A protein has these predicted regions:
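CBM-like carbohydrate-recognition segments
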Residues: 103-106, 110, 115, 121-182
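Acidic/His metal-coordination segments adjacent to aromatic residues that form catalytic metal sites
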Residues: 25-39, 93-103, 174-181
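Short, contiguous, pocket-lining structural segments
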Residues: 34-48, 66-73, 106
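Long, well-ordered core segments of solenoidal/helical folds
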Residues: 2-19, 23-29, 71-89, 134-152
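Surface-exposed helix-capping loop/turn segments at secondary-structure junctions
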Residues: 12-16, 59-66, 86-92, 124-129, ...
Length: 182
């Protein structure tokens, strides 16, 4: 039920994306007073949701009553995620729909989650095989854009947002400025 609730409350049909958060009471400083949604699409929040949704099906029997709804959500997620894949690099932006906006940056953890989601969903047959090309572009982009070999031969993943959230201490207001500052 939580998966369907979040899809119903955070999905934006104009962009095909899911907002970072939703406040039922619509009282949080970041919440839209009409919808309760946060003001932006943070890629890592979408990535965590996508990974969770695709993983849940591993524990859900094929005849489970709500399985078709989950499959619809997975296909909706795939469509939205691929729509915002950066064409040159194959990875995704920190603020998903704000490509090339000054200050926005290509972000590794969200891109990794999106690649995981797309690969698993294709491999399990949850989404059409045509999404495999986007998953491969994303994987190759991860390697080219974010993996750095250190002088000692170890590897580092770069361009990872340290932390972001909504509400609480400080000005965690979900604004574009907040996300690019993290």
């Amino acid at each position: 039920n939580q998966i369907k609730l979040i899809a119903r409350k955070t999905y934006d049909p104009k962009t095909g994306l899911f907002y970072h958060g939703w406040d039922e009471s619509k009282t949080q400083n970041w919440a839209n007073k009409e919808t309760g949604c946060s003001p932006n699409f943070w890629s890592r929040s979408i990535g965590w949701y996508a990974a969770a949704v695709v993983d849940v099906l591993d524990y859900m029997p094929a005849q489970f009553e709500g399985r078709d709804s989950i499959m619809t959500i997975i296909n909706t997620l795939a469509e939205g995620i691929v729509k915002y894949q950066e064409p040159e690099t194959g990875v995704w932006w920190q603020v998903t729909d704000q490509n090339n906006r000054k200050g926005n940056y290509l972000e590794s953890s969200a891109s990794s989650l999106f690649v995981y989601f797309l690969c698993k969903a294709v491999n399990k047959g949850y989404i059409p095989v045509e999404y495999k090309a986007a998953a491969e572009r994303g994987f190759n982009g991860l390697i080219k854009q974010f993996i750095k070999e250190e002088p000692d031969g170890s590897y580092t993943i770069t361009n990872c947002c340290a932390v972001a959230g909504l509400g609480g201490k400080g000005n965690r207001d979900g604004s574009f400025a907040y996300y690019i500052g993290e």
